Amino acid sequence: MPLSHRQTLTRYLIEERRRFPEASGELNALILDVALACKALARVVSFGELGDALSDGSAAPTGGGINVQGEVQKPLDVQSNEMFIRMNEWNGQLAGMASEEMEEPYLIPSSYPRGKYLLVFDPLDGSSNIDVNVSIGSIFSILRAPADVVASGRDVTEADFLQPGAAQVAAGYTIYGPTTQLVLTVGNGVAAFTLDPNLGEFLLTRSDIRVPEQTQEFAINSSNSRFWEPPVKRYVDECLAGKTGPRGKDFNMRWVASMVAEAHRILMRGGVFMYPRDTKDPAKPGRLRLLYEANPVAMLMEQAGGRASTGREPILGVSPTALHQRIGLIFGSKDEVERIERYHQEPASNEAAAPLFAERSLFRD
């Protein structure tokens, strides 16, 4: 099927840059290199079990290690991280990088020029799904390097990356599913690009994506229900009560165990995703990482008319305190996220306004 009439990612970025005559084009070049890393990873993923990258990390010489998160690395975790580094370290646009798979920031080698941006990424989200052929993805966030880093050329430190999500200049993800799609914002709405395997180019297939304000779908890992805080229990119970409950309509519950897949579904047709703060592990008040998971998804949601929150405050307003900081995350259709925020704000005595939920949860503790 000829798709030559569709806009390429390169053309899209050029036309976006024209809105800012003073722009140098460095951001465009960086995004295109990120896209190249995603293309390379898409090719590896497409071979599935025909290749070596999807095998059990415990049996592979390049996998089976433990990353900074305390998670066992599969070969593709390691390979995807290496792809992102090699595709982006040389281009002269970056002052440094940070990844889920690396404990410390990655310093640009002295043999390459340094630039004015920072790249933060999760090279392979949903890697627990690799062996069962469920959609996985890559997430990235682009920040400006502090002025003194650019002026002096000094090595970046962890503190240079600790910027609130509102400071992002671009964010996106690539989902490796039946097709490979790159979803991107440069601060002027959200667009989706599908990888044409014949041309090897990302082509614009959706522009000005908007998240429906209302929904009848929610995504949460119900196995953690005994650890949820009362506002989250209340919200889920009300959804599960369906037409006979206070919401007066039926809801469907989803869970893919891949935040990229969940975010993509919500951007395309609405919904709300919850991986909230809970009491399961006091040392981890949230499961997802702020800088390279919550922040880029929050920027995409907000740019698409949705909302992203901890339940207590907007994600984009949170000031990070550590490179791998975890946080509770709720995002999706604006009306639903705001409802959950209201439940967090109401006094505890009002959290069980409906008698059905005053004494028990539909999820038994």
Curated annotation (Swiss-Prot):
It comes from the Bacteria. It is found in: Cytoplasm. One of its GO terms (biological process) is fructose 6-phosphate metabolic process. Binds 2 magnesium ions per subunit. Keywords: Carbohydrate metabolism, Cytoplasm, Hydrolase, Magnesium, Metal-binding. Disulfide bonds: none annotated. This is Fructose-1,6-bisphosphatase class 1 2. It comes from Cupriavidus metallidurans (strain ATCC 43123 / DSM 2839 / NBRC 102507 / CH34).
